[in-house]
């Protein structure tokens, strides 16, 4: 909760109520992890499953939160459809899971681990551009995203010369050219590359047609609508915490 006092003397008390539920899984026949740094949920009327990447077994673990059962789908490690260590995951459905790996490819995998589609993201990167799909919460989090309405994949990039960040949108059917959405720099620290080491990259997430992002060194939240190009920012400072 946050309690503050306005200049007129009135007290403002903002409380956030959180509801949590602990789910205990019994001992399983498969070797699952204690925690999954890469995971994506599937929710529906009769489905409540978390799919996580098991880096030890190079598999996708399906954790059913209702039946408390864990099933495993092994990812191909060799052959023409080989997948290396994952960098991102986005679950569209139980039978359609998009994953990105260290080779800068994105794969569409079904519930049996069969690769149904491959997208080479290197084709959409300029010579001086780096791909930033990452889920290291100590550094930054920029997720892989699949927009089902637009049939597209979205991911963060950075131009190494200009240091400008942009989200690129690649359309699966290739009927449209790649779309580029440039992120606004920080309102507080416009040049985030100077003196912030590994905390200079933005955290990026997606909700529908909105890109939501912030910079780890400050508390403002930024939004960009990819349809209307409308940009907004929320200066999340308080009486007790400055924006930096």
Predicted features along the sequence, with ranges:
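Blade-loop segments of beta-propeller domains
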Residues: 69-103, 119-133
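A short helix->beta-strand "capping" segment at the edge of beta-propeller domains
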Residues: 9-36
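Short glycine/acidic-enriched loop and turn motifs that connect beta-strands
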Residues: 56-58, 105, 159-163, 218-219
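Structural signature of eukaryotic scaffold interfaces centered on beta-propeller domains
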Residues: 35-44, 88-92, 136-149, 198-207
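Bacterial signal peptide processing site
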Residues: 2-6
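Asp-box/WD-like beta-propeller blade repeats and closely related beta-sheet repeat scaffolds
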Residues: 104, 111-149, 156
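Beta-strand-rich domains and repeat architectures in extracellular enzymes and scaffolds
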Residues: 26-58
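Beta-propeller blade signature
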Residues: 164-174, 223
């Amino acid at each position: 909760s946050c309690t503050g006092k306005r200049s007129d003397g009135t007290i403002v008390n903002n409380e956030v109520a959180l509801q949590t539920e602990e789910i205990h899984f019994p001992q399983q026949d498969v070797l699952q992890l204690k925690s999954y740094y890469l995971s994506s949920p599937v929710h529906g009327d009769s489905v409540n499953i978390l799919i996580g990447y098991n880096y030890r077994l190079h598999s996708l673990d399906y954790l059913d939160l209702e039946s408390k059962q864990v099933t495993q789908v092994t990812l191909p490690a060799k052959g023409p459809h080989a997948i290396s260590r994952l960098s991102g995951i986005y679950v569209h459905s139980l039978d359609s899971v998009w994953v990105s790996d260290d080779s800068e490819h994105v794969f569409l995998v079904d519930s049996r681990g069969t690769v149904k589609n491959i997208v080479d993201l290197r084709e959409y990167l300029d010579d001086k551009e780096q791909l930033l799909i990452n889920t290291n919460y100590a550094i930054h989090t920029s997720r892989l995203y699949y927009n089902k309405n637009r049939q597209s994949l979205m991911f963060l990039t950075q131009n190494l010369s200009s240091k400008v960040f942009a989200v690129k949108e690649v359309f699966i059917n290739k009927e449209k050219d790649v779309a580029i959405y440039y992120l606004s720099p920080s309102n507080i620290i416009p040049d985030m590359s100077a003196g912030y080491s590994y905390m200079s990259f933005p955290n990026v997430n997606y909700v529908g047609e909105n890109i939501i992002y912030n910079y780890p060194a400050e508390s403002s939240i930024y939004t960009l609508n990819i349809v209307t190009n409308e940009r907004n920012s929320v200066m999340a400072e308080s009486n007790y915490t400055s924006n930096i």
